[in-house]
Amino acid sequence: MKHIVKQKYLVSPNRRGAGLDIFIDFPKHVLHMKQHEKNGQYFLMYYSDIEKTQFEKSCASKNIITMYDNSYFEYKIEGKVPSMAKYVNDIWSNHPDIVMADVDTSEYNDTWSEFTVKKLCTDDTLLMAIPHGDSLDELSEMISAMDKDPYISIIGIPYIFPNGITRMDIIAHCVATGNWCWSKAVHMLGIAESNEIQNHKDLIRICQNIISIDTSYPVLLGCDGVSLTTNDNNLFDQPKPSFNIINCPTDKTDESVISNNIKVFKDTINAVTSGFAKIALVGASGTGKTTTAVKIAKLLGDNAIYLKYPPIHDVCDYRDPEKANLATALYTGCNLMAAHIQAAMFGKTVILDRCLIDNIVYAKFNHNDMQVEIFSKAFDKFCGDISSIGWTFPLANEDIEDDGKRITDRGVQLQIHNLFAETLFLSDLDLKMLPASLDGTLSVEDRIESFLKSI
């Protein structure tokens, strides 16, 4: 197996020490292969870089127990995000060795494992428990108990419960109450999509949902004073994070709130690891970034992932400049960090529609350089491995499409364009500038063709 990689994250052995160790990592293809001590079967852990059909074929052999990392797979089924129960039923139903148990908080007690699990499992069964309940406190306590339960191998959390409680709510509550579990392969991984952000208080869900124990590097976003260490068993010790959440105040003169947000943003920069974004398109509004990025990602197919930057009008509302306060800029910057972390989990070429360069430029535009150094430091941390920057010039002789949010004023557009020039060329950024985007006389289609040739 030439794709086998060195272990980075060791999860607790299968129940009762059956000899079936689970290794979690995020390189491509095979993560770990181990022969079962009792029956000689092989256990394979696959990364999500394989398609569903390939995975089903790998399940065909009776001599191989195959487990599929769901962190990316959940985005692939019919273009939707299925529940954990659907995931297990669809993929693992042909494995009698793997059993799913839906457990309500009212059912889970000291005797649940000893009696119920024995009915579900034989000695070599891999049990996945999916908790349900109406109370965040009860769910949090049950998840913590399951983590210590020797009979439970994997804990699965659906994205959303019938009563409206989301996986992000549960994760946030587990962290807040000290019940976060670190010893098992807990499939809670998932970064909130932009349409899940209804208001600024939802940032708590973004920040605390990016705690990733499916990867080698558990990521803590927005935490203060947390250090990650490993013990002798190569398990990450459970930290005691104190989360300071970024707020977007209605009172823009609230200096204490803005000061706290600046501190949280700086702490965030120090707490998370760099992403793997490769190409970022930057530039003023209405210059063809999104159109170009989407088409390029489509042409590159499975070799690329397109990540859209959170709407820039969250940072710079041209129709009401007073809304463009620093607190909102910091909030949007954290969303971008989430995109970088998401990109890190795929290991493919990533096309970014905007990046932190845009944050720097718009912070200058709105705040006269106030706290711009925060975004500059964040850029060094998160964008240091971007290999190419495409700076989009205003399109020649074309009107800017008005979507009700972007600027259509050529004068303001050119003012921002000049700020990009100042930021890109008066800085120490060591970046490859893509000629496809540097020619304002080219149409979008011509830019795409030239862009593809340049990469």
Place the predicted regions along the sequence by residue.
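Non-catalytic, usually N-terminal nucleic-acid engagement modules in DNA/RNA processing proteins
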Residues: 1-122, 226, 273
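Eukaryote-skewed repeat-based solenoidal scaffolds used as protein-protein interaction platforms
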Residues: 80-213, 217-222
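Conserved substrate/cofactor phosphate-moiety recognition/catalytic segment
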Residues: 294, 298-338
